[in-house]
């Protein structure tokens, strides 16, 4: 069989079928969508995530060694942690993570923040020490 007769018997049709073209376009669009889903352009929306109660320098400056537990509760509110293994220490913890909107808008003063204030008491419930004042915003 010569090459010419083989070409005639193959029944080659030009690629004009509309349904085949439609399949290629749909497959291409789906491929691009799947590829783009891994990019940051189509990221998941994240909310601002504040956890705990924020404490300011103004509040912390009202704390003094010699205060009782009720006075500390009045100024700062309930602590985030009252450790059963160390009952003479109260931990005030605040953590903030900026969400999608703050990042997209590029707000300069919105950033992730973390605070950890520790208040120590003696056995009579009187403040003996305060740690973590440097982690509080001004």
Swiss-Prot record:
GO molecular function: protein-macromolecule adaptor activity
Record has Signal as a keyword: yes
GO biological process: Gram-negative-bacterium-type cell outer membrane assembly; protein insertion into membrane
Source superkingdom: Bacteria
InterPro entries xref list: BamE (IPR026592), BamE-like (IPR037873), BamE_dom (IPR007450)
Annotated localization: Cell outer membrane
GO cellular component term, pick one: Bam protein complex
Key words, A-Z: Cell outer membrane, Membrane, Signal
Pfam families: BamE
Function: Part of the outer membrane protein assembly complex, which is involved in assembly and insertion of beta-barrel proteins into the outer membrane.
Family the entry assigns: Belongs to the BamE family.
Protein name: Outer membrane protein assembly factor BamE
């Amino acid at each position: 069989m010569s090459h010419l007769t083989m070409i005639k018997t193959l029944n080659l049709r030009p690629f004009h079928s509309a349904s085949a073209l439609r399949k290629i376009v749909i497959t291409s669009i789906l491929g691009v969508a799947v590829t783009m889903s891994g990019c940051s352009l189509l990221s998941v929306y994240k909310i601002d995530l504040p956890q705990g109660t924020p404490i300011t320098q103004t509040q912390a400056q009202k704390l003094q060694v010699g205060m009782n537990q009720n006075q500390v509760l009045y100024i700062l509110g309930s602590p985030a942690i009252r450790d059963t293994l160390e009952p003479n220490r109260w931990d005030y913890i605040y953590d903030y993570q900026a969400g999608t909107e703050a990042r997209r808008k590029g707000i300069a003063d919105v950033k992730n923040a973390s605070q950890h204030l520790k208040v120590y008491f003696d056995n009579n419930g009187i403040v003996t020490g305060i740690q973590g004042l440097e982690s509080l915003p001004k």
